[in-house]
Amino acid sequence: MAASPEDRNLSDIRLCPIAGIRLGTAAAAIKHVGRDDVLLIEMAEGSACAAVFTQNAFCAAPVTVAREHLRQAPRWLLVNSGNANAGTGTRGLADARASCEAVAALVGGRADRVMPFSTGVIGEYLPLDKIRAALPKAFEALSEDGWEAAARAIMTTDTRPKKAVRRIEIAGRPVVVSGIAKGAGMIHPNMATMLAFVATDARIGAGLLQSVLERAVNRSFNCITVDGDTSTNDACVLMASQRSEAPLIEPGSAHVEAFQSAVDAVLAELAEAIVRDGEGATKFIRILVEEAASEDEARLVGKTIAHSPLVKTAFFASDPNWGRILAAVGRAGCKDLDISRVAIWLDEVRIVAAGARDREYTEARGITVMRRPEITVRVSLGRGQASARVMTCDLSLDYVRINAEYRT
């Protein structure tokens, strides 16, 4: 996808090491030879860990195991790319647990303190022997400076690594939040193919950390879509090593909002990076829904527009077929929507006013906007004060090619 003036080169972002968090990678040749595809993350003893997972009923075996192990104060994360270990039944569960046992044997810990994550092709058994063989190298590579290699090791159809970092001060003491993510297709997270791993040195309890993560995910990863498909393997993990000299962040304290804002910003940047790297994407689309009755309603309207194949192909063709956007708003399910109060813009051009084509709108003005690499669709429902933002991309011929050829 072509870069815009606002599109920073995310590959150039340098992530800050997090004291107490070490990462190591290795090549297991799961799908590609000579490329790191196994990631091991170690959290110092006493770290807190929060996570959210896919809501897909056919969740992958590692998701089931990771959910169980999250309750055991996990210390290690094991991630592999190239194989999703989804749709693999009881053997898949056994393989996921065996991979945790392999890590435990290597580090001298407990298997139920290892959380497994996988991403890649669905329906194929995990190459457990390859992963076992790669683990010693990943363990030897563990380093607080391992973020760059980690960001690349978790990639599948991604064209570039996704990284984000924020530095804040709490009571005059520095706190860092660093994160990586992967995802380019099968992207319609509902945490509920997308993985994100974020770490901080903040001092914060696991319960509050979970609340912060859930709020941040709902405003970021749950507001993006590339193709409307929710992966079997989606997961987002937030780790806190407790190593900062800043005071403990406690519920109700003035420090919670500052920390929440930092996590929000990191996840929002990672979410945007995923959309910008959408499979075959040529355009980045923001959808802003305003004057809705509730934030949920605004998000629903935004997602309905973003999911529409007709809307997405119109963006790819630079075709200002605004009727497709209007139809998406109408079928979003807003109860008792007064269409005479609805207005729609493409960037600065108003295309719909009072529920009908704007009198000053021309096809030429619409085409001018639709040819841009970044476009904002703004919808005013005229029925409240709530708003939401959803991010998506166009649907191109390359998207069809990439996914048609994914296994061939």
From Swiss-Prot:
UniProt protein name: Arginine biosynthesis bifunctional protein ArgJ
GO molecular function annotation: glutamate N-acetyltransferase activity; L-glutamate N-acetyltransferase activity
Keywords, comma-separated and alphabetical: Acyltransferase, Amino-acid biosynthesis, Arginine biosynthesis, Autocatalytic cleavage, Cytoplasm, Multifunctional enzyme, Transferase
Site (Cleavage): 192-193
Enzyme class, spelled out: transferase
Keyword Transferase: yes
Active site positions: 193 (nucleophile)
Major site of localization recorded for this protein: cytoplasm
CDD domains: OAT
Known EC number: 2.3.1.35, 2.3.1.1
Residue(s) at site: Involved in the stabilization of negative charge on the oxyanion by the formation of the oxyanion hole: 119-120
SUPFAM superfamilies recorded: DmpA/ArgJ-like
Organism: Methylococcus capsulatus (strain ATCC 33009 / NCIMB 11132 / Bath)
GO biological process annotation, one example: ornithine biosynthetic process
Pfam families, alphabetized: ArgJ
